[in-house]
């Protein structure tokens, strides 16, 4: 099992550790690759990572395929889920050469819709601030590596993800601006291109992914199974009294993936 983490996540994220516990229980090998800059070590290139980073996903899966001859089951969480779906869309029928099945959990399938949701109300006051507090210092470290890489003042003035993506994420990764990035990196428009067993998990009360944009079965095609529970939040799916027990998600997703081998 290989898990691709979410925005500013890591192998220490609660969901990564919950899936690790499930993999140990099932006696399966398990790996969490870190997107660039998320391991605690600054990457060396003039770039970071983004929601449509399918080339990075492909490079990692190719290396895993070279080293592991058995089935590979891929899981993507939030940003990692969207990027994993974009990889499967780009690969089409070739994706099954690398993985047997994949699951996406709480992926922001429509980045513009999620960007608007994160930029409003409580989300803006809490989550936007949290993300920027993590990403801005990394951007400064990147600028120290590559002077002139982006507009320092504009980055420091960014008050939401739209602003940050416009000055940092988009130009560093080949996009014209935030709109171009969000449009081209969103997995939603091309889901019917996927040609291997895929599970899309999205809670209908996810504060980052509006229920109105979630696809129905007709839109996604025959290779994709949808699980859209009323509750679950954003990568929550806890059971029991708060703060809840987190094994529900890996048990459900893991069982589905193992059945596809």
Per-range role (PLM):
Residues 1-6:
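Short beta-strand element of the alpha/beta-hydrolase
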Residues 9-12, 20-44:
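Conserved alpha/beta-hydrolase
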Residues 36-73:
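Catalytic nucleophile-loop/oxyanion-hole region of alpha/beta-hydrolase
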Residues 68-172:
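Alpha/beta-hydrolase-fold enzymes
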Residues 167-190:
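Active-site nucleophile elbow and catalytic-triad environment of alpha/beta-hydrolase enzymes
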Residues 194, 200-202, 206:
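Short beta-strand/loop motif that positions the catalytic acidic residue
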Residues 204-225, 229:
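Conserved loop-alpha-helix segment in the C-terminal half of the alpha/beta-hydrolase fold
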Residues 232-247:
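Catalytic histidine-centered segment of alpha/beta-hydrolase-like enzymes
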